[in-house]
Amino acid sequence: MNGLSVSELCCLFCCPPCPGRIAAKLAFLPPDPTYSLVPEPEPGPGGAGAAPSGPLRTSAATPGRWKIHLTERADFQYGQRELDTIEVFVTKSARANRIACMYVRCVPGARYTVLFSHGNAVDLGQMCSFYVGLGTRIGCNIFSYDYSGYGISSGRPSEKNLYADIDAAWQALRTRYGISPDSIILYGQSIGTVPTVDLASRYECAAVVLHSPLTSGMRVAFPDTKKTYCFDAFPNIEKVSKITSPVLIIHGTEDEVIDFSHGLALYERCPKAVEPLWVEGAGHNDIELYSQYLERLRRFISQELPSQRA
């Protein structure tokens, strides 16, 4: 679809959809969970274990220590040593959903922790191999979470829940691990750029990375859309100018899901944008396979952040 026809315009303005419906139709494809959380026994009276029994999937979160159990579909690429670096727990959002969180200690004493908001149609189980590899290669620890309705997180996916979910993750990272905002890099991929831009527009942090970002839901569905309507969803284009931290935008020139023009438009609207990474020939899901991806991330983190230039 390359633009708005007369009938589509009539439909939009006579019966405009609510942002939630646009969001649901465009964005959310939660996979079947590829993991569960298994309680670790804790010392109790007389040495007895005091952890709850049974795996945690969508049941109420309980205090205690948990380990992640991955299914074959998670396709974990590492061994037990790397798996032992992954901490998992469940927190609660302001919208009363239980949000699964993952902290990957890739580098002891790392200067930065990346708060990673993943793309669509994946969950923490499928992403944890990538997190181990990414954190090790860029010298950062990785913190991530599953959106409402993804993985073992409860609730249903929605735009409002996305914003509440990342707020819960941000607070958990800061309070549970004592990570200060100037040590947090917000990283959003695809649909994950939506909560990332929203949070970054409200809080200052060390830096922001937008990987294959979208400008808004309407602009994805109707590429000729030039303005943001009141019923639009995911209005990154209206929020990106409010970000006060350095922003690196990464986009493939042959992106078949979110057109390259979205990355260009956000770059032009973002006063804190640094030199972007436009990956020639890359699509929506293969940017990480190009050597310049890691090279640009390393240079951004090691040379271009204010704390590194001081």
UniProtKB/Swiss-Prot annotation:
Please state the Enzyme Commission number of this protein.
3.1.2.22
Q: Name one GO molecular function term.
A: palmitoyl-(protein) hydrolase activity
- Main EC class the enzyme belongs to: hydrolase
- Main location as per UniProt: membrane
Q: Tell me the Pfam families matching this sequence.
A: Hydrolase_4
Tell me where it resides. Cell membrane; Endosome membrane; Cell projection, Dendritic spine; Postsynaptic density membrane
What are the GO BP annotations of this UniProt entry? Answer: negative regulation of NLRP3 inflammasome complex assembly; negative regulation of protein localization to microtubule; positive regulation of protein localization to endosome; protein localization to membrane; regulation of postsynapse organization
Q: Is Membrane one of the keywords UniProt gives this record?
A: yes
Name the family the entry cites: Belongs to the AB hydrolase superfamily. ABHD17 family.
Q: What is this protein called?
A: Alpha/beta hydrolase domain-containing protein 17A
Q: Which organism is it from?
A: Mus musculus (Mouse)
